[in-house]
C-alpha cells in the first residue's frame, strides 16, 4: 500500500468534490514527487515553437474588449469582410479603430464631428452604412442621385420647406406677371372696375370673393305717384293693400314695404327739422 498522506489521490479526491470509481496507488512515487533510484529518468527536448503565435508578442492579443484600447478582432468575420468590429455599448468607454474596408466607417460619431472641415455634406457621407446593399439600409444619400437603375449621382440634401415655399411663390408671381402683360381677356375682372383689368395691388392668384353690389333700380314717376297717394291716405299700409299695389305697379311685396318704411322716416326727419327751425 502507498503512503497515507494528504497528497494521496484517495484523500485529495473527496476533499475537492471529485469522486472516482477506482483509486490507484503507485508505491514507486513519493509524495514529494521525487523518483526512486531504480527508475530511469526520461529526458524531453524543449520546443519553443509549440505555442508560438503568428503575431509579435509585443502586441496585445485577447478576445475581450479593453477600455480605451484597441478593439478585438473577430475570427469569423460575417459577409466576407476582412475586418469586423464588435458592437459595444455606448455606456462603456470603448473606442473602436477604423476598418480597412469601410474607410473610417467604424469611428464614433463624436470623433467624426471633431474632425476639421467636417460639414453637413461630409457628415452625410460618413454616416453612410458600409454594409452590402442587400441589407436594405434606409438612408443612402450618396447613391440616391441616379434613378432606379442604380446609377450613382452627386450627393444632395433634401429640399427644405422654406425653399419650396419660395419657389412656389416666385413661380406664381412670374405667372401673374406674364398673364398681366399678355392682357388675357379671360383674366379676373374687379367688380369695382369692370372695364379695366386687375388693380396694381391685387394678386392674380387671389380669388375675389367680395359680393358685387346690386345695381339700383329707381322707381318710375307713375309708381312714385301711386305710392305717394296711398301714403297720404294711410301711412301704415295693410298686407292686403300692399299686395294689390305690388301687383298693379309691377313691384314686389318687399319693395312696397321698404318704400313705405323709408317714406315714414323721411316724414319724421322733416317734422324734426321744422321743430328745430321754429325755436329760432
UniProtKB/Swiss-Prot annotation:
Localization, per the record, is: Nucleus
Q: Where are the transmembrane segments?
A: none
Q: Which residues bind DNA?
A: 212-271
What keywords are annotated for this sequence in UniProt? Developmental protein, DNA-binding, Homeobox, Nucleus, Transcription, Transcription regulation
One GO cellular-component annotation of the UniProt record comes to: nucleus
Is this entry keyworded Glycoprotein?
no
Residue ranges with Low complexity bias: 159-173
- GO molecular function terms listed in the Swiss-Prot or TrEMBL record: DNA-binding transcription factor activity, RNA polymerase II-specific; sequence-specific double-stranded DNA binding
What the entry lists under PROSITE patterns is as follows: HOMEOBOX_1, HOMEOBOX_2
Q: Where this protein primarily resides, as one coarse class?
A: nucleus
Q: Does the keyword rRNA-binding apply?
A: no
Under the heading InterPro entries, the entry gives: HD, HD_metazoa, Homeobox_CS, Homeodomain-like_sf
Any Pfam family: Homeodomain
Disordered: region residues: 95-212
Job description of the protein: Sequence-specific transcription factor which is part of a developmental regulatory system that provides cells with specific positional identities on the anterior-posterior axis.
Which PANTHER family does this chain map to?
A: HOMEOBOX PROTEIN HOX-C12, HOMEOBOX PROTEIN HOX-D12-RELATED
Q: What is this protein called?
A: Homeobox protein Hox-C12
Per the UniProt record, the source organism is Mus musculus
Q: What is the lineage of its organism?
A: Eukaryota, Metazoa, Chordata, Craniata, Vertebrata
**Gene designation per UniProt:** Hoxc12
Amino acid at each position: 500500500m502507498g503512503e497515507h498522506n494528504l497528497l494521496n489521490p484517495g484523500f485529495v479526491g473527496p476533499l475537492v468534490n471529485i469522486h472516482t470509481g477506482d483509486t490507484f496507488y503507485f508505491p514507486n512515487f513519493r509524495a514529494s514527487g521525487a523518483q526512486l533510484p531504480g527508475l530511469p529518468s526520461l529526458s524531453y527536448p524543449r520546443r519553443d515553437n509549440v505555442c508560438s503565435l503568428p503575431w509579435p508578442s509585443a502586441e496585445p492579443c485577447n478576445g475581450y474588449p479593453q477600455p480605451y484600447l484597441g478593439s478585438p478582432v473577430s475570427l469569423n468575420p460575417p459577409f466576407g469582410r476582412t475586418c469586423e468590429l464588435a458592437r459595444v455599448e455606448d455606456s462603456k468607454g470603448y473606442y473602436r479603430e477604423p476598418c480597412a474596408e469601410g474607410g473610417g466607417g467604424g469611428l464614433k460619431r463624436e470623433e467624426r464631428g471633431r474632425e476639421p472641415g467636417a460639414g453637413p455634406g461630409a457628415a452625410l457621407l460618413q454616416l453612410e452604412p458600409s454594409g452590402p446593399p442587400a441589407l436594405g439600409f434606409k438612408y443612402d444619400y450618396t447613391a440616391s442621385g441616379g434613378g432606379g437603375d442604380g446609377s450613382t449621382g452627386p450627393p444632395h440634401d433634401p429640399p427644405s420647406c422654406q425653399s419650396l415655399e419660395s419657389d412656389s411663390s416666385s413661380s406664381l408671381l412670374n405667372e401673374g406677371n406674364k398673364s398681366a402683360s399678355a392682357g388675357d381677356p379671360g383674366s379676373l375682372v374687379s367688380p369695382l372696375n369692370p372695364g379695366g383689368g386687375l388693380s396694381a395691388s391685387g394678386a392674380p392668384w387671389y380669388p375675389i370673393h367680395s359680393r358685387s353690389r346690386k345695381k339700383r333700380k329707381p322707381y318710375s314717376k307713375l309708381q312714385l305717384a301711386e305710392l305717394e297717394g296711398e301714403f297720404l291716405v294711410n301711412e301704415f299700409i295693410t298686407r292686403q293693400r300692399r299686395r294689390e299695389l305690388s301687383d298693379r305697379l309691377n313691384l314686389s311685396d318687399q319693395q312696397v314695404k321698404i318704400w313705405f318704411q323709408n317714406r315714414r322716416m323721411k316724414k319724421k326727419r322733416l317734422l324734426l327739422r321744422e321743430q328745430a327751425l321754429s325755436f329760432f
